[in-house]
Amino acid sequence: MRVMHLTCDVAIIGGAFSGAATALLLKRRNPALHVVIIEKSEAFDRKVGESTTEVSSCFLTRVLGLTNYLGHHQLAKQGLRMWFARSEDEKFDECAELGARFNSRMPGFQVDRATLDKHVLALAVAAGCELIRPAKVVKFELGGAGSSLLELIEGGESRQVLARWIVDASGRAAIIARKRGYMQAMPEHPVNSLWARFTGVADWDSIALREKFPKWAAATVAARGWATNHLCGPGWWVWIIPLKGGDVSVGLVYDERLFTPPEGTGIGARILAHCREHPIGREILADAKVIEGDERAFSQLTYRVTQVMCDGWACVGDAAGFIDPLYSPGLDFCSFTAQSVANAVADACAGKCVDIRDYNRRFAFCFQSWFDCIYRDKYFYIGDAEIMAAALLMDVATYHLGPVKQVYSDPATMFGAFPFDGFAGRVAAKFIAFYNRRLVAIARKRIAAGTYGARNAKWRLLIPGFTHEPKQSGRLLFSGIRRWLWMEIKSLWLRKKPSQPAEAVVKNPADAETERAATK
């Protein structure tokens, strides 16, 4: 076998979004850098991470400059919506709904990741990056800046790449973190997922549904079908995301402590079986058919990486850790890490000092804070519409007052600063983590009392819209706080129901006891 040698400034393992974005930012910062991208696949396949947030949309449009591409080749996202029911027999138009009254006031997109990744990689190559594809990294040696070595197999031939810096953008494969023992599971958040793409999904905004459920259709002027719709239940939630061309992504995420998905022979069939037990899913997915071969399952979704940068290497995107798909934070982390690592590597290649210890400390604090604030034990209350209404208002308002306001204030530089950086960020983290703990405590009381999900029908919370303007988001934040404090007061009178174990309510909130509580 002939061995070919290549020397470069930066070698990036993985050419999907995080790797390609990092490469593109490096070339924009210093066009003279020799950047090599190593991608194992011949063509990208579809992956999750299809829904953007206001933060990742800012990165896509104002940092990468993809506004025109996204407008022509992807879908505009119209916020998120959550649907709840007291039982599977609930009427479709009586399910509790949380969402927007109007279309989104800030940019957001529903993206086919295969085509988005392909486009960003093409931009990186056009900017002067060298692409080696398909090629598999079979071995690496991290010798510090200037002396790290990658061994590849490309087309049956062996190649060696000597790089000043290596960037791991290999996603969940997390090549460096796994090899070095830096990857850790997070048993405190045992969430798993099943997902697939479907055809034949009903149009949320169709004339047929409008005629069948006129009051439901008239309740909002927003386009429900372009939102990320969530079916919510105790210990689980389902995303329903439309994609360009008509396919629809549907995924089930669940906490294995609280919920067990249906058994079955196929992932898509199991997802449909579960969704059709929810009144909304039964209507919207009545004629849905799974796209063969386009279905996946992951256990232990959540993991952390204890060191994400060292002398001569760094991790970006999912190679640096992953928390949870709820609220679509994946591309946010990709955006912050791509910009931060590109800044650090460009500085190092220019002979500037990079504070690696500080970077690892700030990233670890951001990652842990994001988990504690938003996700720790959230699946205990995700199936209760009243609790989630307060959580949604506070979560999204603080998100807009914090990260969204941060990046829109100066997109060119603020993606280099992690959320929760600084004194104000730390204070905000303590507050958000506190109210999350209190909502969990309220949910546990309701579970024990048999009243969990009692208000999951016959009302809706329709929000005028979120922006990063303090007045608007502040008003919604205080609305969420009022709801939270009122639930705290009501929970003082809740008493555990001795005849029914708490687990029964969590596993099946639609039993007779819960239904009786819901009708009082």
Task: Place the predicted regions along the sequence by residue.
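Predominantly flavin-linked oxidoreductase catalytic cores and closely associated redox partners
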Residues: L123-I280
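N-terminal FAD cofactor-binding segment of flavoenzymes
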Residues: D45-D89
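Conserved Rossmann-like nucleotide-cofactor binding loop
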Residues: S18, T22, A43, A173
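Glycine-rich FAD pyrophosphate-binding loop
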Residues: K27-V48
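FAD/FMN-dependent oxidoreductases across multiple families
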Residues: P234-W236, P242, L258-Y375
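Short beta-strand to alpha-helix junction loop
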Residues: R101-A122, T260-E263
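Beta1/beta-strand and adjacent pyrophosphate-binding region of the FAD-binding site
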Residues: V3-S18, V36
